[in-house]
Amino acid sequence: MDTNNNIEKEILALIKQKVSPIEYENCLSQLKYNPNASKSDIAFFYAPNMLLCNWITAKHGALLKEILSQNKVGMHLAHSVDVRIEVAPKIQISAQPNINYKAVKTSVKDSYTFENFVVGSCNNTVYEIAKKVAQSDTPPYNPVLFYGGTGLGKTHILNAIGNHALEKHKKVVLVTSEDFLTDFLKHLDNQTMDSFKKKYRHCDFFLLDDAQFLQGKPKLEEEFFHTFNELHANSKQIVLISDRSPKNIAGLEDRLKSRFEWGITAKVMPPDLETKLSIVKQKCQLNKITLPEEVMEYIAQHISDNIRQMEGAIIKISVNANLMNAPIDLNLAKTVLEDLQKDHAEGSSLENILLAVAQSLNLKSSEIKISSRQKNVALARKLVVYFARLYTPNPTLSLAQFLDLKDHSSISKMYSSVKKMLEEEKSPFVLSLREEIKNRLNELNDKKTAFHSSE
């Protein structure tokens, strides 16, 4: 082994003793010593990308300086050593694979664009991040992870990024984690992993839907880990979609959770009434269906689960009107949509309510069951009380015991507090939270119903 490699190994060994295993494995282990630029009073290092370069300089620059000032590690260094970290020069890839990215099986859907994405207060941040990512020649944030409940437009925004990138003649791969797994297993069985790696690692935009389903599959996680690292090191844009934040993806390897949070994460909130009405109008236009204004308003007000349900309601009204040879009016809409208006959250268990609130606020259920002064935990406990009073027959005493409350009168105060935020203050955050929690409750209860019906 040459002297420079020995020096680098010595430096990394000293760093490893001073930082946590996760920080070392995910970040600091990627430092490369640059002997050509280093001098007696300055030690130069390479980091694989600007994000790591800035992060290590800000968080561990002083530590590196201290280590090198106190340990000579084979270098002729002065007593006081400065440390510089730069982005490593890109390695030219000699032979690019000849892949038709637009012909990949899991390709981008042409119908999902930025132009037909309805923007509201619930998703404006996500929309702006997505547009910036799609329009930039180099990744402004990497990776990007959007998360939120089902049917809120996450897949639409992912495809919109892909479509815009394709217009700029970029190489785009858009795939669900399920299809990524299927493709991985196929190439593994056929012993053609080189082809698999070329397909997914030599693109400009790697867009992954349903990232949460990577968890619990060690071989797939290992392959994705290396795919992610190579794409990131080569400044290729990575965008991930998930139904929950990285820290709440149970069973996902810590090193992947860490990488998912390297760039920027943004939550897609349920649409408010104004946005829902805009979505209903747009879906009518896309499906070439004409509905009276009052019917569109009725759908926006009463079909609150998700965007797909709103579109389903529009089509259901139109189909029934044609079959019955009847004009579309409010009475017809009410009759046709009666089953969709039923609140599936009725009869929820306290455990499901606790889980739905925890998922919506990115908390653990165990955190909510213990009294805390943290604002998000206090709000979560109030929301559990609010939904329990709405949807369960549990008496105040059992609810107080469930949340470990000594004073049973606190239940009424907590319920009234949420009601005030919703009805008097009309807090946009709490209003959107209510919709998201209801959506999650519906999903949890529907799963329970499906399970019992299959027994």
Swiss-Prot record:
Pfam family for this entry, one: Bac_DnaA_C
Signal peptide annotation: none
Region (Domain III, AAA+ region): 107-321
Any GO BP: regulation of DNA replication
Highest taxon above the source species: Bacteria
Keyword terms of this UniProt record: ATP-binding, Cytoplasm, DNA replication, DNA-binding, Lipid-binding, Nucleotide-binding
Record carries keyword Hydrolase: no
GO molecular function: ATP binding; ATP hydrolysis activity; DNA replication origin binding; lipid binding
GO CC, alphabetical: cytoplasm; plasma membrane
Region (Domain IV, binds dsDNA): 322-455
Keyword Cytoplasm: yes
Region named Domain I, interacts with DnaA modulators: 1-75
Chain's role: Plays an essential role in the initiation and regulation of chromosomal replication. ATP-DnaA binds to the origin of replication (oriC) to initiate formation of the DNA replication initiation complex once per cell cycle. Binds the DnaA box (a 9 base pair repeat at the origin) and separates the double-stranded (ds)DNA. Forms a right-handed helical filament on oriC DNA; dsDNA binds to the exterior of the filament while single-stranded (ss)DNA is stabiized in the filament's interior.
Family: Belongs to the DnaA family.
Record remark: domains: Domain I is involved in oligomerization and binding regulators, domain II is flexibile and of varying length in different bacteria, domain III forms the AAA+ region, while domain IV binds dsDNA.
Record note on quaternary structure: Oligomerizes as a right-handed, spiral filament on DNA at oriC.
Name of the protein: Chromosomal replication initiator protein DnaA
Species per Swiss-Prot/TrEMBL record: Helicobacter pylori (strain Shi470)
